């Protein structure tokens, strides 16, 4: 069940209905459906976030298991953890009661003075590269990133020039890794189990996928890694490289499959939410290559390599996980709405 506004309540406060949930640690551990358990946790987190952004209110939870007693059984540790997602000090902002087959969670309004931010957010979905990882930044760091972009009117799509001389001779710099990756990207073919001369870095991500999981995993990897590269200084995602052995393996695919895969990658990139603080309002610039991997006598697999350029402003992997009530409906902030709400003076 989706989180909905209870329009039939006699309560003077805003009431959100999350439907029937299994409550209590023992009963939640017995739940057979992992998907249902995950969905219930997501609904609780979403409801708390929504009320924090809507002046506070009440979450109405129907108790699925009739023998539940709040004092004896509690909510369940996983549901409690879901309450923590928005609220580090739960007891200061929530009160929980049980009455007539329902649990009611009373949520106070969000406070700028207390939290230092204008709205509550479960996930920003804003990634940057940090050394060799794509890292999602928290709301406070996202605000700082956005404020910097606003002050400068965006940023140049060309990264800052690095010193010609290395500070520590013999130490491999991040920029040197990019220099090693570029010739590999420019190749027209590889030999199976050929070595490649670089590791993961700020500019490079390498991963090995099988043909069976290829399309699903690419849809998961593209938004996170390419948005992170775009928000940093650009970079390469090599799909088909064994990072542990530093060998080129590739993934098995028919030639006819590559066109469909390229179309899916393009769709993923075009759907990435962006906001602008610059006049140019440019689109995400990228190049995608499929490079054949040869065994003696035949092509046996392919390496897929999207390369994305540094972006002028900010790229999100998805709309931020933040909700509010509008026109008696629970609505997710669009990226533009979220950015405006975070930065509203």
What do the PLM-derived regions correspond to, one by one?
Residues 1-345:
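Conserved N-terminal catalytic/coupling substructures associated with nucleotide/phosphate chemistry
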């Amino acid at each position: 069940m989706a989180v909905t506004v209870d329009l039939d309540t006699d309560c003077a406060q805003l009431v959100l209905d999350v439907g029937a949930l299994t409550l209590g640690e023992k009963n939640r551990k017995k739940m057979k459906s992992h998907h249902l358990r995950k969905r219930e946790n997501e609904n609780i987190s979403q409801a708390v976030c929504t009320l924090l952004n809507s002046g506070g209110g009440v979450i109405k939870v129907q108790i699925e298991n009739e023998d539940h007693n709040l004092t004896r059984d509690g909510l369940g540790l996983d549901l409690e953890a879901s309450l923590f997602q928005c609220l580090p000090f739960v007891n200061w902002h929530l009160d929980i009661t049980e009455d007539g087959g329902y649990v009611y969670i009373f949520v106070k309004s969000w406070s700028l003075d207390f939290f230092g931010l204008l709205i509550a957010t479960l996930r920003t979905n804003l990634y940057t590269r940090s050394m060799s990882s794509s890292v999602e930044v928290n709301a406070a760091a996202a605000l700082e990133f956005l404020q910097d972009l606003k002050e400068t009117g965006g940023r140049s799509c060309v990264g800052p020039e690095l010193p010609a001389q290395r500070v520590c001779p013999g130490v491999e710099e991040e920029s040197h890794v990019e220099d090693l990756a570029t010739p590999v990207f420019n190749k027209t073919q590889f030999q199976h189990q050929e070595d490649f001369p670089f590791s993961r870095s700020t500019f490079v991500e390498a991963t090995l996928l099988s043909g069976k999981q290829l399309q699903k995993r690419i849809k998961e990897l593209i938004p996170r890694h390419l948005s992170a590269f775009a928000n940093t200084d650009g970079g390469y995602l090599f799909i088909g490289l064994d990072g542990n052995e530093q060998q080129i393996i590739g993934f098995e695919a028919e030639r006819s499959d590559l066109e469909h895969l390229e179309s899916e990658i393009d769709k993923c990139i075009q759907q990435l939410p962006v906001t602008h603080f610059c006049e140019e309002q440019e689109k995400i610039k990228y190049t995608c290559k499929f490079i054949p991997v040869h065994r003696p006598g035949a092509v046996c697999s392919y390496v897929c390599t999207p390369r994305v350029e540094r972006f002028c402003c900010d790229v999100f992997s998805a709309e931020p996980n933040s909700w509010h009530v509008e026109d008696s409906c629970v609505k997710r902030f669009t990226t533009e709405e979220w950015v405006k709400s975070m930065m509203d003076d």
